[in-house]
Amino acid sequence: MARDSKPTTRRSVLKKGGIAVGIGMGLAGCSGNSGGGGAETDSGSTNSGATTSADNGSEEVDITFATTQPPENVSVQAAQEHFIDVIEEETGGRISVSLEAATLGGTEDNLDALEAGTVDILHESPTALSQRFASEYSFAGDPFVIEDMEHYSAVNEEYLKPEDGLNGILLDNGIRLGDAFYVGNRSFTSNTSVTSPEDVQGLKLRLPQYDTWTSVWDEIGADVTPVAYDELYSALQTGVVDASEGPISQFLAVSLYEVQTHFSVTSHLLDTKHFLYNEEFYQGLSDSDVELITSTAADAVQGMTEDIKSREEELYAQAEEEGTTVVPAEDVDRAAFVEAGQPALEELSESKWAVSISDVQDLA
């Protein structure tokens, strides 16, 4: 389902000229999105960022690799160690990777650049992909659907990566879906311990404005209240909202420990990101380079996941040092939350999703 080849001059000119699609970064309400960048390369290619013309893996390849996260983010550092460094070392520098971390703008800017071919590889979430390309696949990033990384990997193989799944829709837009890695668990911030659905009844909960997320939390019993992300701190401080949700990294980055006493590890949403490839770049690679890059990515997501999980534990400890009560996952009755939200999940699977919630849950 690869897309038709696009005019080759646009990609070549954009990459050689290093035209910036946009500059800036900002924490999005979902989990903190910013950009990657328009790297300047002079590959001499007329149809791809990769300067391959033979299948023997002997040609030089220049890859522009973007992420919305800044260089100090653990996911960026892990990608450098487990993917970029490995690729360059394995090929003795024949394949070089230009890392553009938080230099392109937000999620939409990065996806624009990937589609245009000014970026060859990008890390992005299933939520971002479903919002832009295929809302029927939002289940991969909706609350209380995915249990853990093993479950997500099974869902990825069954429903996302096949060409009759999400990947086919992405390929029609010039993007190929690759392997996924763990980014973090979205959990609950409040001024009381949250361990069961009873604890959230009537709480004014700030959520990103995703209809599917709102449906589930409404069903569970929270009073979902829209608040712009840049107003979250003050809204919690003044009581406009009682609670929020997000990863521990976000909780610390915006100092929510100053206005919330508890961080309850509800693990209601598994944050993941995928390796995404510009399809024209991918098709321009030799067979051996395709194998090298994709197999290295498959290995990298394992190491990246381990590094990020380890860092997450350190952040929980850091939050406790700031005076936060961290309610551990083992104290949370997650099954009760899933049961409470199940009617909404079933309605979503019937009216919006490409697959049934029971089929997704059966893969756990």
Residue ranges, per PLM feature:
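Terminal disorder- and signal-encoded targeting elements
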Residues: M1-Q69, V74-D85, E89-R94, S98, ...
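Short, glycine-/small- and polar/acidic-enriched structural segments
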Residues: N56-D62, P71-R186, D242, V265-L269
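Short helix-initiation/N-cap motifs at beta->coil->alpha
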Residues: L99-D112, Q209-T212, V224-T238, E330-A335
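Structural motif corresponding to alpha-helix initiation and N-cap regions
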Residues: T107-E108, V194, Y229-D230, A298, ...
